[in-house]
Curated annotation (Swiss-Prot):
Name under which the protein is recorded: Large ribosomal subunit protein eL18
One GO biological process term: translation
Pfam families: Ribosomal_L18
Stored SUPFAM superfamilies: Ribosomal proteins L15p and L18e
The family this protein is said to belong to: Belongs to the eukaryotic ribosomal protein eL18 family.
InterPro entries, alphabetized: Ribosomal_eL18, Ribosomal_eL18_arc, Ribosomal_uL15/eL18, Ribosomal_uL15/eL18_sf, Ribosomal_uL15_CS
Record HAMAP family: Ribosomal_eL18 (MF_00329)
Annotated keywords: Ribonucleoprotein, Ribosomal protein
Gene Ontology MF terms: RNA binding; structural constituent of ribosome
GO cellular component labels: cytosolic large ribosomal subunit
Length: 122
């Protein structure tokens, strides 16, 4: 291992990135490759999104992937499907209370293998 690793040393994140790259190749869906690139970033550059931002950028019924952590800041009043690397319990509760659905990223890839209609929020 190099003296200063610049990617994830977390084995689960590395496996997730590998899974996303394989899904991108198998399904000819470049969205999963882009998500893998975000997942592989160093810790200081990882994505953190609040629920309030989802409320601003997503439309009713959207499918959204957050290639990082989803936190509970703000309000959500739209029914959306959200997948993220990590989701705080309060954020998950807010999404579910708004009528949405919370998935893991692998579940989202299996549900939408081509990535059609999936939006990346960073």
């Amino acid at each position: 291992m190099p003296p200063n690793p610049t990617g994830p040393t977390n084995s689960q994140l590395r496996m997730l990135a590998r899974f996303l790259r394989k899904a991108a190749r198998a399904n000819s869906a470049s969205i999963w490759r882009v998500v893998a690139e975000f997942v592989e970033k160093p810790r200081r550059q990882r994505v953190i999104v609040n629920v309030g931002k989802l409320n601003r950028v997503a439309k009713e019924g959207d499918v959204v992937v957050v290639p990082g952590k989803l936190l509970a800041g703000g309000q959500l009043n739209k029914k959306i499907i959200v997948a993220a690397v990590k989701i705080s319990p309060k954020a998950a509760r807010k999404v579910i209370e708004a009528g949405g659905e919370v998935l893991t990223i692998p579940e989202l890839v299996r549900k939408y293998p081509r990535g059609s209609g999936v939006r990346i929020v960073i």
